[in-house]
C-alpha cells in the first residue's frame, strides 16, 4: 500500500502546504514521458484487479522525479485516491471481492460488490474510490473538449483540481435537456404489445428512470421514486454525497500552492445536494407536461441515509425561475461552489425542509408530507376492485385475490417441517402424517364458505397453487374463460404432496410417486417448478422420452431465469440419454454458468462434447434452430410475456404499484435493463 504524500520526490509536501521549496504544481505542464493519454490512465483501473491498479498508480507517482515526471492528471489522481483512503481497499477486497466496470452509457465507473455482507465503512471506502474515478473520467472529458484523446500531461495537477471543482458545480447544466424530454419517444412505454397511457404512471416512471440512468454525475446516484399521474406529482428520494467525499485541498493559482479546504467540504456537499435536486426536478418535470409538482428528498450518503433536505418544486417557478439561473450560469458560478444559501434562493421552492448548522452541514429533517392517489396497500390487504380489463386478464375481482405469498398457517407449517426432519426414522409414518396434512388442507379448501357461495351463484372456481408470484398472473394461459376464478390452496398441502412424491420414489413405489406428482401439476398449471417431481420420477425409471415431453410442457409456462435454466438442464440430460446429442448440447448451452445448475451443466456439457468427438457441430451450427426443429419451447414464450407486459402496464397505470412490482422485476431481468430494474425497485419500495 502506498501513501502518495509519504513517498520520495513528493515536492517536500511533508513539510506542509506551501513549504519552502515546494513546486508550483499549477505552473506549466510537464511532458508525459510515457506518452499516456487520460484514457490510458483510466483504462488501467479496469485492466487489473482494482487494488493492484490503485496501488500501481500511487507507486508510479510516488517514484516520479525530474527525469520521469508524473503527468498532472496522474498526480491529481494520486492525490484524490490518497484522500479517499484507497490503500485500505486491498484489505476490504480480500473479504469482499470488488469488480470495477466501465458503463457504456455514461463512460463512468461502477463498482460491483455484495452490498448485503459488507460493512457501512467498507462500502463507503469503495464508493469514495469509485467517485474519484468518476471525477477523473469527467475531468478527462473536460480536457478532451470533444477533440478526442489528450495526453495525461495536457493539464497540470492544479488545472485538474480546478476542472474537478468545475465538475462538482456544473452537474445541473444538463437540466434543460432533461426538461425538454417529454416530446421524445419513450422506448420502454410499450411492453410486449401493451402501451402505457401517455402521461400515465408507467410512461412517467420509465421516462424518469431513463433520465436518472443517463445522468453523468461524479458520485453514485441511488434513487427511488413514486410517479402519480393523478395528482401530477413525482416524489423522489435520492442519495447525496456526504462531506467527506469532497476534495480536501485545492490549488490556489494566485498563491501558487495547495490550500486546505477541509472546512469548506460541508458547504460543498450542501451546494452539490441543491444542484442535484434541481437536476432531478428537471428530469421529473421533463417526464410529462402533466407533472406540476416535484418533491426531492435528499438522503445523506446513501438511499438508506437520513433525510437532510426535502424540497418541493412547482412547475412554473422552476421553469421560469430556476432554469433561468441554470441557463445564464449563475447556478454554476465558481463563487457558489460552497455556497448553498445563494443556490437555495435560486430554486424558487414552493416548500422546503432545509436546515444548515453553523458549520454549514446539513441537518436531518422530516420529509415534506404529500398526498398521492397512488396507494401502497399490501396486496394481501388491498380490497380495491380491478378494472374490467384486469379482471378478465387475471381472473380476479379485487387486488387481494392476486396474493399468493402471504403466510397462511404458521402452526401447520411447523408441523410439516417437524415431519420432514424426522421422516428418515420411519418413512411409513411420514407418509401417513403427510397424507393427513393433504386431507386436512383439501377439506379446508372444499369447505371455504366464500368459495362455496361463488359456486352456488354459478361462478366456476378452480383451486390454484402458485410456486411463485408470477404464476398467479399467468392463469389466463391455463383457462381462456375470463369468468373462471381461482382459489388459493394451502402452500403446506402442496408441499406435503410434493414430499409424498419424493418419499414414494425413495420407497420404490414409482406409480404412487407419479400420481402425487401429477396432482401437483394439476393444482399448479402455471408453475414450472411443479413439473420437477414428475421429471425426477421419470428419471428414476429412466423414462427419458417422457421427461422430454414433460419438460416441454414446463417450458411453455416458465418465466424466471432459474426455472428456465433448470428445465433445460434436465432436458439436456434426457436428450443425451436418448442419443439426441445435438439437442442435448443445445439445451446445455442454455444453462448459464452463473445459474444454480451452471456448474453441473458445464461439467456435463464437457463430458457430452468429449463423447461426441468428431461429431461436435461446427461454427455454422445454430443451436436455437436445432431446438426449434425439435419442438422445444424457447422460454419465456411470447404469449407468456404478453400477459406479463399487459398486467404490468395496467396495474402500474391504475395505481397498484405493489401488484405491478414483481412483474416489473421479471421484465427487467428478462431484458437485462437497468432502467426497468430501477422502476421495479421504486414500485416495490416507494419512498
Q: How would you name each of these model-derived features?
A:
Residues 411, 415, 497, 531, ...:
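TPR repeat positional signature
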Residues 400-405, 440-493, 520, 555-564:
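Flexible helix-coil transition and linker loops at the boundaries of alpha-helical arrays
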Residues 525, 559-562, 596, 671:
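Short coil turns that delineate tetratricopeptide repeat
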Residues 2-399, 564:
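Long, charge-dense low-complexity segments
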Amino acid at each position: 500500500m502506498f501513501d502518495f504524500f509519504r513517498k520520495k520526490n513528493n515536492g517536500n509536501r511533508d513539510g506542509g502546504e506551501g513549504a519552502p521549496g515546494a513546486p508550483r504544481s499549477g505552473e506549466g505542464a510537464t511532458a508525459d514521458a510515457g506518452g499516456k493519454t487520460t484514457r490510458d490512465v483510466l483504462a488501467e483501473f479496469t485492466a487489473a484487479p482494482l487494488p493492484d491498479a490503485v496501488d500501481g498508480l500511487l507507486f508510479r507517482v510516488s517514484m516520479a522525479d525530474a527525469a520521469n515526471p508524473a503527468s498532472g492528471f496522474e498526480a491529481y489522481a494520486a492525490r484524490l485516491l490518497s484522500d479517499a483512503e484507497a490503500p485500505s481497499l486491498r484489505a476490504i477486497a480480500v473479504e469482499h471481492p470488488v469488480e470495477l466496470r466501465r458503463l457504456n452509457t455514461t463512460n463512468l465507473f461502477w463498482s460491483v460488490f455484495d452490498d448485503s455482507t459488507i460493512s457501512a465503512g467498507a462500502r463507503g471506502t469503495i464508493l469514495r474510490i469509485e467517485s474519484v474515478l468518476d471525477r477523473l473520467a469527467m475531468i478527462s472529458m473536460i480536457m478532451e473538449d470533444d477533440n478526442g484523446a489528450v495526453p495525461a500531461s495536457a493539464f497540470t495537477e492544479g488545472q485538474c483540481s480546478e476542472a474537478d471543482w468545475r465538475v462538482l458545480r456544473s452537474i445541473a447544466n444538463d437540466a434543460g435537456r432533461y426538461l425538454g424530454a417529454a416530446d421524445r419517444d419513450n422506448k420502454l412505454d410499450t411492453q410486449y404489445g401493451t402501451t402505457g397511457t401517455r402521461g400515465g404512471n408507467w410512461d412517467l416512471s420509465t421516462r424518469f428512470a431513463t433520465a436518472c440512468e443517463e445522468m453523468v454525475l461524479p458520485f453514485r446516484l441511488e434513487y427511488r421514486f413514486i410517479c402519480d399521474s393523478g395528482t401530477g406529482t413525482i416524489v423522489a428520494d435520492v442519495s447525496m454525497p456526504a462531506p467527506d467525499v469532497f476534495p480536501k485541498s485545492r490549488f490556489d493559482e494566485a498563491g501558487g500552492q495547495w490550500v486546505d479546504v477541509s472546512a469548506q467540504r460541508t458547504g460543498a456537499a450542501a451546494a452539490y445536494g441543491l444542484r442535484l435536486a434541481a437536476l432531478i426536478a428537471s428530469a421529473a418535470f421533463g417526464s410529462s407536461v402533466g407533472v406540476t409538482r416535484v418533491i426531492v428528498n435528499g438522503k445523506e450518503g446513501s438511499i438508506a441515509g437520513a433525510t437532510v433536505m426535502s424540497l418541493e418544486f412547482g412547475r412554473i417557478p422552476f421553469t421560469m425561475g430556476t432554469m433561468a439561473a441554470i441557463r445564464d450560469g449563475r447556478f454554476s458560478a465558481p463563487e457558489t461552489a460552497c455556497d448553498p444559501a445563494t443556490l437555495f434562493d435560486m430554486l424558487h421552492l414552493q416548500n422546503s425542509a432545509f436546515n444548515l448548522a453553523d458549520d454549514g452541514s446539513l441537518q436531518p429533517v422530516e420529509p415534506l408530507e404529500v398526498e398521492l392517489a397512488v396507494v401502497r396497500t399490501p396486496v394481501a390487504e388491498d380490497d380495491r376492485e380491478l378494472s374490467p380489463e384486469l379482471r378478465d386478464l387475471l381472473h380476479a375481482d379485487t387486488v387481494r385475490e392476486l396474493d399468493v405469498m402471504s403466510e397462511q398457517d404458521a402452526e401447520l407449517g411447523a408441523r410439516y417441517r417437524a415431519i420432514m426432519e424426522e421422516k428418515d426414522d420411519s418413512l411409513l409414518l411420514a407418509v401417513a402424517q403427510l397424507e393427513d396434512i393433504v386431507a386436512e388442507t383439501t377439506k379446508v379448501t372444499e369447505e371455504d364458505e366464500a368459495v362455496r357461495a361463488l359456486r352456488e351463484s354459478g361462478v366456476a372456481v378452480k383451486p390454484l397453487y402458485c410456486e411463485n408470484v408470477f404464476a398467479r398472473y399467468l392463469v389466463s394461459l391455463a383457462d381462456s374463460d375470463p369468468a373462471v376464478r381461482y382459489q388459493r390452496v394451502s402452500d403446506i398441502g402442496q408441499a406435503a404432496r410434493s414430499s409424498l412424491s419424493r418419499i414414494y420414489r425413495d420407497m420404490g413405489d414409482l406409480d404412487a410417486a407419479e400420481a402425487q406428482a401429477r396432482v401437483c401439476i394439476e393444482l399448479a398449471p402455471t408453475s414450472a417448478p411443479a413439473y420437477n417431481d414428475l421429471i425426477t420420477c421419470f428419471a428414476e425409471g429412466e423414462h427419458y422420452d417422457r421427461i422430454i415431453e414433460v419438460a416441454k410442457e414446463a417450458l411453455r409456462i416458465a418465466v424466471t431465469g432459474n426455472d428456465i435454466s433448470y428445465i433445460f438442464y434436465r432436458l439436456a440430460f434426457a436428450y443425451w440419454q436418448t442419443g439426441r446429442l445435438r439437442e442435448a448440447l443445445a439445451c446445455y448451452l442454455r444453462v448459464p454458468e452463473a445459474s444454480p445448475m451452471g456448474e453441473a451443466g458445464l461439467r456435463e456439457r464437457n463430458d457430452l462434447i468429449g463423447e461426441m468427438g468428431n461429431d461436435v457441430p461446427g461454427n455454422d451450427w445454430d443451436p436455437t434452430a436445432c431446438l426449434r426443429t425439435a419442438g422445444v419451447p424457447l422460454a419465456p414464450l411470447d404469449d407468456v410475456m404478453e400477459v406479463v407486459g399487459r398486467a404490468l402496464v395496467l396495474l402500474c397505470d391504475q395505481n397498484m404499484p405493489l401488484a405491478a412490482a414483481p412483474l416489473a422485476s421479471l421484465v427487467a431481468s428478462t431484458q437485462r435493463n437497468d432502467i426497468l430494474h430501477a422502476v421495479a425497485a421504486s414500485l416495490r419500495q416507494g419512498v
